[in-house]
UniProtKB/Swiss-Prot annotation:
Organism annotation: Brachyspira hyodysenteriae (strain ATCC 49526 / WA1)
Keywords: ATP-binding, Ligase, Nucleotide-binding, Protein biosynthesis
GO cellular component, one term: glutamyl-tRNA(Gln) amidotransferase complex
Enzyme active site: 81 (charge relay system), 156 (charge relay system), 180 (acyl-ester intermediate)
The name this protein goes by in its record: Glutamyl-tRNA(Gln) amidotransferase subunit A
Length: 482
């Protein structure tokens, strides 16, 4: 196995034991990225590599290692999504609107990685302002799936997922508003975690939909995911949505023992012909192995799950319209040149600075808050959101973990996102976006491949702030399928 194929914990052990030095490690990864970028079908996981800075940080990390310092991420190269603040570094959310913008401070999640010794190697590509599921709406080019370059990596954290899957980073940060960590993790065959809403600070992450957004890690295995989640989690006094409650040691909880734990299977996620046969078969086989390890299978129902995609669209677009209001070319954003009145200036800034997908969501969200639709659609969506929360609360009275496919299908071909069947799209959204609507923790873990050798993901969901059981079940699955 090549060094860049190792996990965070494995490479830390080699750094600690002086089997490899940090500058050599960072230089090797950067050279691999640069070599790949010469290809016509380059993966294009990164918008920017912090080459000189990363190499300098690696030298300092090695000095600290030589002096006996021991931190969980010391000398480990990690990546961050292009919507996370890293002081004095470019941050564009893959949009022309923020072209040339530099972050004025470092996000707490990024700072916590740095405080634990990580080397931030670069910023990764994404769908513009995190609006998309394929990483094809980026203003700076598409990212390809490392497992098959003709396919999408998923989105919106497709660059982060591709970087980890291609061994261009040992781990990465992404953001998840409606599956934007878990779905690309599934498509690229890696692990992706969306922690409980309020477990990890959102400060320093460009807001898409403030009641849904959550920052989380993408890694090569469950143990690394547990480690990174532990590091970035916790109260931040500047972040109003984080709760001041203890963060468990998730790595220590990975004992592989799930005997007596109850797994819930929601009929709404399985009783449909829209799930690809390979996906359903692999997920059910994995559940069977968990049962063999002593877990109990319980049939449950989430009756309002079928409305999830529509509820998500209404809530998300309204919040998008609100959050995107600041990008007017005056406070933030693209500054058009010419003689304009105020309305013309706003129009030109947004028309040039924002891509179609983003403009469409702003328009739909604005429409939803108008008199005609506010009560009949938006307010109704909020009520159904509450019913969905009650469904999950009731389910968790009887089970410890809910298990589902992360996506009913595997990664599609590049350039085909507008050809997806609407019913399938609604179902795919419901697997992941429902979890954001109710603020639960969930993670995607690899679960075999389909007939075309494309990765399949299995999703583990637990009640709020019970990431321990989520990681424990995911780890048991991982051990059973090695």
């Amino acid at each position: 196995m090549e060094l860049n194929e190792l996990t965070i914990i494995q490479i830390r052990e080699k750094l600690k034991n002086k089997e490899i030095d940090a500058p050599t490690l960072v230089d090797s990864i950067i050279k691999n990225i640069e070599e790949d970028n010469k290809r016509d079908d380059k993966i294009y996981a990164y918008l920017e590599i912090f080459k000189e800075e990363a190499l300098e940080q690696a030298k300092k990390a090695q000095e600290r290692i030589n002096n006996g310092e021991d931190l969980p991420l010391l000398g480990v190269p990690l990546a961050i999504k292009d919507n996370l603040c890293y002081k004095d570094h470019l941050m564009t959310a893959s949009s022309k609107m923020l072209e040339g913008y530099k972050a004025p401070y470092t996000a707490p999640t990024v700072q916590r990685l740095i405080d634990n010794g990580a080397i931030i190697i670069g910023r990764t590509n994404m769908d513009e302002f995190a609006m998309g599921g394929t990483t094809e709406t980026s203003n700076y080019g598409v990212t390809r799936n490392p497992k098959n370059r003709a396919h999408v990596p998923g989105g919106s954290s497709g660059g982060s997922a591709a970087a980890v899957a291609a061994n261009f980073a040992f781990g990465a940060l992404g953001s998840d508003t409606g599956g934007s960590i878990r779905q690309p993790a599934s498509f690229c065959g890696i692990v992706g975690v969306k922690p409980t809403y309020g477990r990890v600070p959102r400060l320093g992450c460009i807001a898409m939909a403030s009641s849904l957004d959550q920052v989380g890690p993408l890694t090569k295995d469950v143990k690394d995911a547990a480690l990174m989640t532990k590091i970035i989690a916790g109260f931040d006094p500047k972040e109003s949505t984080t709760l001041n409650i203890p963060v468990p040691d998730y790595v220590a909880a990975l004992d592989g023992n799930i005997k007596g734990m109850k797994i819930g299977l929601a009929k709404e996620y399985y009783d449909t012909d829209l799930i690809a046969a390979d996906v359903k078969e692999n997920v059910m086989d994995a559940i069977g192995k968990l049962k063999d390890q002593g877990a109990e299978i319980v049939d449950i129902s989430l009756p309002n799950a079928k409305y999830g995609s529509r509820v998500y669209t209404a809530v998300m677009d309204v919040e998008v319209a609100s959050n995107m209001g600041r990008y007017d070319g005056i406070r933030y954003g693209y500054h058009p040149k010419g003689d304009f009145n105020l309305d013309e200036y706003y129009y030109t800034s947004r028309s040039v600075g924002l891509a179609f997908e983003t403009r469409a969501r702003i328009l739909f969200g604005t429409l939803m808050t108008g008199k005609r639709f506010f009560y009949s659609h938006y307010q109704h969506a909020l009520k159904v959101r509450k019913l969905m929360q009650m469904d999950f609360d009731n389910a968790f009275k009887n089970v410890d973990v809910i298990v589902s496919p992360t996506s009913p299908v595997t990664a599609g071909l590049l350039g085909t996102r507008d050809q997806t069947d609407s019913a399938l799209s609604f179902l795919a959204d419901s697997y992941v976006s429902n979890i954001n609507l109710v603020g639960l923790p969930a993670m995607s873990v690899p679960c075999g491949v389909d007939k075309n050798n494309m990765p399949i993901g299995i999703q583990f969901i637990t009640k709020q702030f019970n990431e321990v059981d989520m990681f424990r079940m995911a780890y048991a699955h991982e051990l059973a399928n090695k």
